[in-house]
């Protein structure tokens, strides 16, 4: 299915591009499973759920310079706030050429640049913020957005957050501030999978109507009902981009499935932070055959 790129009025992605994105996503799932299995530690559930989104964002939507720089001048920049989904982040960065894919084999090892939660201390290309503590990424992204405005850099800032992360009060200060200051060059995406470490978000602390809350704070809101469909993701991102620089910050509500692509991990918080055993790894890899070559 082809869709319209709302910014350039061209049909995109093509079938060839869609196939490429699907192949990268499948390989990314393999990377995630193998990374957390090797060290018997990590967060596969949310990583799998955001694979399609991050693959599409980095490969088809974001404007990225060939060489990574922390200042991000004259390019779009991305902040991962829910840093526990580092496996998918590292895989996407590696598959985009930020660093060698073989380095994925060092995930969570001592002295590795690929720690369980991303940090800037290791100097890993693509990582702009340490994001172990939840609820801080949006504030930093808003600061970066203001910096771009001051420097007359007409590129965008993206931030990915978890839905359970909205239970952190700092987010709501940031949400209020961004609208009050017309920070209209930011696109914040909320991964709405309805799961967090202790159970469903409804059982832990109900989020209520997230769309209504963001709109009441002065944000434009785009909903992607199938956040695991690449075509829908692309369309939603392009629609979000078309809403930028119009006086309001933009929020995407991305409705994903925890553990998507591995049947026994789907729809449950139990795989928020648990690694598969040998048998489970084999099943997961069979469901996601190698497409780009394993590291």
Model features per residue range: what roles?
Residues 2-86:
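N-terminal amphipathic, basic-rich helices that act as targeting or association modules
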Residues 14, 18-21, 25, 29, ...:
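Generic structural signal for well-ordered, non-membrane alpha-helical segments
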Residues 42-44, 104, 251, 295:
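Flexible, glycine/charged-enriched surface loops at secondary-structure junctions
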Residues 53, 89, 252:
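A residue-level signal for conserved active-site and pocket-lining positions in enzyme catalytic cores
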Residues 63-71, 75-77, 116-295:
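Glycine-rich ThDP/TPP pyrophosphate-binding loop and its adjacent helix/strand module
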Residues 88-99:
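Alpha-helical support elements that line or immediately flank enzyme active sites
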Residues 100-120:
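Anionic-ligand anchoring segments at beta-strand to alpha-helix junctions in alpha/beta enzyme folds, i.e.
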């Amino acid at each position: 299915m082809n869709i319209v790129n709302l910014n350039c009025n061209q049909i995109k992605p093509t079938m060839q591009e869609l196939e490429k994105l699907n192949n990268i996503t499948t390989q990314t799932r393999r990377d995630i499973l193998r990374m957390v299995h090797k060290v018997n530690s990590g967060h596969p559930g949310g990583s799998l759920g955001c694979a399609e989104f991050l693959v599409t964002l980095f490969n088809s939507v974001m404007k990225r310079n060939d060489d990574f720089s922390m200042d991000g001048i004259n390019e779009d920049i991305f902040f991962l706030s829910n840093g526990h989904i580092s496996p998918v982040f590292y895989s996407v960065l590696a598959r985009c050429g930020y660093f060698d894919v073989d380095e994925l084999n060092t995930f969570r090892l001592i002295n590795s640049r690929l720690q369980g939660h991303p940090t800037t201390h290791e100097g890993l290309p693509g990582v702009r913020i340490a994001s172990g503590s939840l609820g801080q990424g949006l504030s930093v992204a808003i600061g970066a957005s203001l910096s771009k405005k001051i420097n007359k850099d007409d590129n965008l800032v993206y931030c990915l957050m978890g839905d359970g992360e909205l239970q952190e009060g700092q987010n709501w200060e940031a949400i209020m501030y961004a609208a009050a200051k017309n920070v209209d060059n930011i696109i914040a995406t909320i991964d709405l999978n309805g799961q967090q470490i202790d159970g469903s978000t409804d059982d832990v602390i109900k989020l209520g109507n997230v769309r209504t809350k963001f709109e009441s704070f002065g944000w434009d809101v785009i909903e992607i009902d199938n956040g695991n469909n690449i075509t829908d993701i692309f369309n939603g991102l392009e629609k979000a981009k078309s809403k930028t620089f119009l006086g309001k910050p933009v929020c995407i509500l991305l409705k994903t499935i925890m553990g998507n692509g591995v049947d026994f991990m789907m729809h449950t918080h139990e795989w928020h932070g648990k690694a598969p055993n040998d048998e489970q790894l084999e099943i997961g890899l069979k469901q996601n055959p190698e497409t780009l070559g394993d590291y």
